[in-house]
């Protein structure tokens, strides 16, 4: 393989892993994948197979934490992806285009692949991983008190196979999540305390005002000089700070937004994108159109929280007070 092909393959693998981590954040390495697979469930009462609504790109991958191996189908039909962690108790059977897998007789399921060779290849890999788990003393110790292996059972083969679509169905784009900034502030703040804050807990500017001797009012010029000395550089907007924070990135990383698998051109099915979802363009800070109105108690609680924790907020309010006081003194 030429260097250019190796580089392209590495870039594609990295892109696929990044998309896979949007479903399972602990995914660390893709062991194999197929462009299409479908899930069948057995109806124990009727003793027949039923095709589920789950089909799409199939991945076998390694995880950074227990369970160490899993396989999944990035469902193209609805947002619910199929994820099956592998354990040493898994029983696997290969029959033509199907792979039967179960941990007990009540949970028998089947994977269907377009090609028998693909089914054989995936079966060999899954069986190898199960054997590796069985050979691990750590996994054996964890499963020592678990139920013994499920007994061998004859599994009825599905009577029909899913028709392979000629073209992957077009799915409507999902709307990005809406951000309620006021709700974010409200949920982040601590419950208001009934007792008044001590002077030591107040912002520096309020401490100075509270410690002034009665009757010795500060002049407007003195207040303005102290304000300039204590002023801090203006920070970015709260919304921008949250968007760039590690909390926003980690939340987006665990998104269950599905991948859309496709038979044929796999590369075109997995779109390259950022982990962080963009903000809705219709959300305008301060517009009042997308945010609920706070009642009196909520507004007082929010203002009290900001007065106690945000020195810059107090400074801005005080600046407005100084400006108003200067205007009043000039008029009078």
UniProtKB/Swiss-Prot annotation:
<comment type="similarity">
    <text>Belongs to the DCP1 family.</text>
</comment>
<dbReference type="GO" id="GO:0008047">
    <property type="term" value="F:enzyme activator activity"/>
</dbReference>
<dbReference type="GO" id="GO:0003729">
    <property type="term" value="F:mRNA binding"/>
</dbReference>
<protein>
    <recommendedName>
        <fullName>mRNA-decapping enzyme 1</fullName>
    </recommendedName>
</protein>
<feature type="region of interest" description="Disordered">
    <location>
        <begin position="141"/>
        <end position="175"/>
    </location>
</feature>
<dbReference type="GO" id="GO:0022414">
    <property type="term" value="P:reproductive process"/>
</dbReference>
<dbReference type="GO" id="GO:0002119">
    <property type="term" value="P:nematode larval development"/>
</dbReference>
<comment type="subunit">
    <text>May be a component of the decapping complex composed of dcap-1 and dcap-2.</text>
</comment>
<comment type="function">
    <text>Component of the decapping complex necessary for the degradation of mRNAs, both in normal mRNA turnover and in nonsense-mediated mRNA decay. In contrast to orthologs, does not possess decapping activity and does not remove the 7-methyl guanine cap structure from mRNA molecules. In the nervous system, negatively regulates the expression of insulin-like peptide ins-7, which in turn promotes longevity. This may in part be through promoting the activity of daf-16 in distal tissues. Required for the developmental axon guidance and regrowth of PLM touch receptor neurons.</text>
</comment>
<keyword id="KW-0507">mRNA processing</keyword>
<dbReference type="GO" id="GO:0006397">
    <property type="term" value="P:mRNA processing"/>
</dbReference>
<dbReference type="GO" id="GO:0000184">
    <property type="term" value="P:nuclear-transcribed mRNA catabolic process, nonsense-mediated decay"/>
</dbReference>
<dbReference type="Pfam" id="PF06058">
    <property type="entry name" value="DCP1"/>
</dbReference>
<dbReference type="GO" id="GO:0043186">
    <property type="term" value="C:P granule"/>
</dbReference>
<dbReference type="Pfam" id="PF16741">
    <property type="entry name" value="mRNA_decap_C"/>
</dbReference>
<dbReference type="GO" id="GO:0040012">
    <property type="term" value="P:regulation of locomotion"/>
</dbReference>
<dbReference type="GO" id="GO:0000932">
    <property type="term" value="C:P-body"/>
</dbReference>
<dbReference type="GO" id="GO:0006979">
    <property type="term" value="P:response to oxidative stress"/>
</dbReference>
<dbReference type="InterPro" id="IPR031953">
    <property type="entry name" value="mRNA_decap_C"/>
</dbReference>
<dbReference type="InterPro" id="IPR011993">
    <property type="entry name" value="PH-like_dom_sf"/>
</dbReference>
<dbReference type="GO" id="GO:0009411">
    <property type="term" value="P:response to UV"/>
</dbReference>
<dbReference type="GO" id="GO:0008340">
    <property type="term" value="P:determination of adult lifespan"/>
</dbReference>
<feature type="compositionally biased region" description="Low complexity">
    <location>
        <begin position="141"/>
        <end position="173"/>
    </location>
</feature>
<dbReference type="GO" id="GO:0009408">
    <property type="term" value="P:response to heat"/>
</dbReference>
<keyword id="KW-0694">RNA-binding</keyword>
<dbReference type="InterPro" id="IPR010334">
    <property type="entry name" value="Dcp1"/>
</dbReference>
<dbReference type="GO" id="GO:0031087">
    <property type="term" value="P:deadenylation-independent decapping of nuclear-transcribed mRNA"/>
</dbReference>
<keyword id="KW-0963">Cytoplasm</keyword>
<keyword id="KW-0866">Nonsense-mediated mRNA decay</keyword>
């Amino acid at each position: 393989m030429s260097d250019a092909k190796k580089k392209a393959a590495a870039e594609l693998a990295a892109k696929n892993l990044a998309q896979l981590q949007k479903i399972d954040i602990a995914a660390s390495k893709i062991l194999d994948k197929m462009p299409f697979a479908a899930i069948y469930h057995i109806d124990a009462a009727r003793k027949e197979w039923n095709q589920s609504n789950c089909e799409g790109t199939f991945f076998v991958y390694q995880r950074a934490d227990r369970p160490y191996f899993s396989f999944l189908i990035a469902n193209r039909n609805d947002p619910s992806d199929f994820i099956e962690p592998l354990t040493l108790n898994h029983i696997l059977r290969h029959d033509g285009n199907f792979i039967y897998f179960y941990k007990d007789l009540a949970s028998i399921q089947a994977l269907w692949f377009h090609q028998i060779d693909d089914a054989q290849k995936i079966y060999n890999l899954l069986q190898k991983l199960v054997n590796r788990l069985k050979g691990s003393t750590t996994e054996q110790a964890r499963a020592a008190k678990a139920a013994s292996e499920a007994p061998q059972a004859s599994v009825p083969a599905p009577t029909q196979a899913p028709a392979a679509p000629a073209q992957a169905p077009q799915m409507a784009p999902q709307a990005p999540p809406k951000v309620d900034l006021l709700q974010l502030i409200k949920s982040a703040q601590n419950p208001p305390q009934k007792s008044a804050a001590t002077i030591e807990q107040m912002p520096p500017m309020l401490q100075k005002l509270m410690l002034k001797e009665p009757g010795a009012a500060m002049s407007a010029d003195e207040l303005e000089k102290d304000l300039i000395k204590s002023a801090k550089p203006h920070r970015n907007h709260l919304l921008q700070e949250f968007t760039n924070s590690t909390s926003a990135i980690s939340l987006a990383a665990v998104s269950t937004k599905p991948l859309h698998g496709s038979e044929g051109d796999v590369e075109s099915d997995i779109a390259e994108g950022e982990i962080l979802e963009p903000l809705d363009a219709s959300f305008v800070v301060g517009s009042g159109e997308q945010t609920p109105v706070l009642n009196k108690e909520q507004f007082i609680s929010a203002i009290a929280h900001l007065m106690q924790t945000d020195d810059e907020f107090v400074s801005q309010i005080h600046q407005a007070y100084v400006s108003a006081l200067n205007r009043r003194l000039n008029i009078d």
